[in-house]
């Protein structure tokens, strides 16, 4: 689903509306701008660059945008503090726990200050205690940052815990949409 929203996979039909604009109508340049400036992605498998430090991983979206090294490292340091990884900026992914790696992935998605976050099962690879802790941190952070988030999960309890509106899908089709209470 998230790969369809940002058109990494081309949908066969329908519309994808972001800010009342149909992403299906975007040309290549407009689509690239959407991906680089408006959408941040958090992946299930962390997708960190092993040859880059934590700070460089976080700063990567800003590097792609052409932001100066000093400005992107300043921004990355601020986000590092927000995700509670102060002091870990010079470490590499293999030196971090799974929960810490996922925090780096979230920090990288937030570094470019996107309007939208696409999160593809971001906590599913983590043990239950770390998963619960990161869910709590995400809830707190989402209240602070005020980002529209599409959070994909196969865990209904997680959806109810972190979601404001939930869409339940079966066989690729939405079968129900509502609030957690509904």
PLM region spans:
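A short, proline-enriched helix->beta-strand linker immediately N-terminal to the Walker B motif
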Residues: 111-115
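Conserved ABC ATPase "signature" region
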Residues: 21-22, 63, 70-88, 140
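Short coil-to-helix segment of the ABC ATPase nucleotide-binding domain corresponding to the Q-loop/switch region
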Residues: 52-59
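Helix-to-loop junction immediately C-terminal to a conserved catalytic motif
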Residues: 6
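ABC ATPase "signature
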Residues: 177-178
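Conserved ABC ATPase signature
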Residues: 92-96, 100-102
């Amino acid at each position: 689903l998230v790969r369809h929203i940002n058109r990494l996979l081309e949908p066969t039909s329908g519309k994808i509306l972001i800010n009342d604009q149909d992403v299906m109508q975007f040309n290549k340049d407009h689509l690239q701008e959407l991906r680089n400036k408006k959408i941040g992605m958090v992946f299930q498998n962390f997708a960190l660059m092993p040859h880059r430090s934590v700070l460089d991983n976080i700063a990567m979206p800003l590097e792609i945008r052409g932001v100066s090294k000093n400005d992107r490292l300043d921004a990355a340091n601020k986000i590092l503090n927000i995700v509670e990884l102060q002091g870990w900026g010079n470490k590499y992914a293999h030196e971090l726990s799974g929960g810490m790696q996922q925090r780096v992935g979230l920090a990288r998605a937030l570094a470019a200050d996107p309007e939208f976050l696409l999160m593809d099962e971001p906590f599913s690879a983590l043990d239950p205690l770390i998963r619960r802790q990161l869910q709590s941190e995400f809830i707190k952070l989402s209240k602070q940052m005020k980002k529209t988030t599409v959070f994909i999960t196969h865990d209904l309890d997680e959806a109810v815990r972190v979601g404001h509106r939930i869409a339940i899908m079966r066989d690729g089709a939405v079968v129900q949409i509502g609030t957690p209470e509904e």
